[in-house]
Amino acid sequence: MLDRAEDFLGRVTFVTGPEKHCGKTTFLNRALALVRAAGERPAFLSVGYDGEARDSLSAARKPSVPVAAGDVVVSAERFLRDGRILPEILETLPGGSAFGRICVARANRSGRIVLVGPEGNQGVSRVLSFLRDEGAARTILVDGAINRITQVASWPGARFVFVLRTDAAGLDKAARQARRLSLLSTLKPVPAGFGAGEGEVLLAGPLTAATAAALPESVRGVSVEDFTKVFLEDGELRSFLSGRALFVGTPIECAGIVAVLRGVSRQTFLSRLDEGTASRVVFNPYELSPEAAA
């Protein structure tokens, strides 16, 4: 799982994570290398700004984003030209960014680049529509914003990879995040006609702890737009599901949970998970990539 080009080919895959420096961009680079090794040239973009050498707040070194000749990449025009990739501009997107116009370009030479992409769901959807409608790329990877899985819902059929990093001090928190996300991604689509029956509620807004507590005891089923509208912690969610059914209007597929461990054994991490969550976990699949081996 997530260690073959076939896991990404012909798909739109968002790479997400709960916090900065969780390994998102490193995983993106790994996935891109797999796709290229299979003879395909992917398209990729970031939601917002990424790719600087060091984080502006922590000064921690961030991985650069390599580009191969033939790749299609989205970024500010100035960064496309600074990356020495000899870009062929395919499209200039409406609006702009703090770094100037954002463009879709095809690289004619290999290099490294700073990614600057659209900020909102509408902007992401616009880019994906262009890439698919114009036949620019069959395989698309998106470096998603921190803790914003809602962006995946901007494109029907897209899926996401959740990357988290943990050490001994953060082990329990990481396990809770993994369990919660795994459970949310298994929620079933709302049945046809749901909401018309007794004890059925179609929520227009988010499901919070306060909302859940205010539901009458007679309510046996609740539906939300998608699982990103569920704001219940792992324990709260499991308690809610023990007495009620929870459905989603738009299911979002989880392709896997990538666990980057520091000073924690794989067995120790897995011991904190239920069977369903453990089956979704991949450990550092980018430890040896085609690029690293070259």
What do these predicted regions represent?
Residues 2-52:
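Walker A (P-loop) phosphate-binding motif
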Residues 12-18, 106-118:
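Short, basic, glycine/proline-bearing loop/turn elements
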Residues 1-9, 37-40, 270-294:
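N-terminal charge/polar-biased segments
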Residues 31-107:
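N-terminal phosphate/diphosphate-binding loop that engages ATP/GTP or pyrophosphate donors
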Residues 25-28, 53-57, 173-174, 268-270:
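Short, glycine/acidic-enriched capping/hinge loops at junctions between secondary-structure elements
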Residues 22-23, 51-55, 149-151, 170:
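Short active-site-adjacent helix-start/loop capping segments
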Residues 120, 124-277, 290:
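Conserved catalytic-core segment of NTP-binding enzymes
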Residues 17-19, 46-49, 78, 144-146, ...:
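Short glycine-rich, polar/acidic loop-and-turn segments at beta strand-coil junctions
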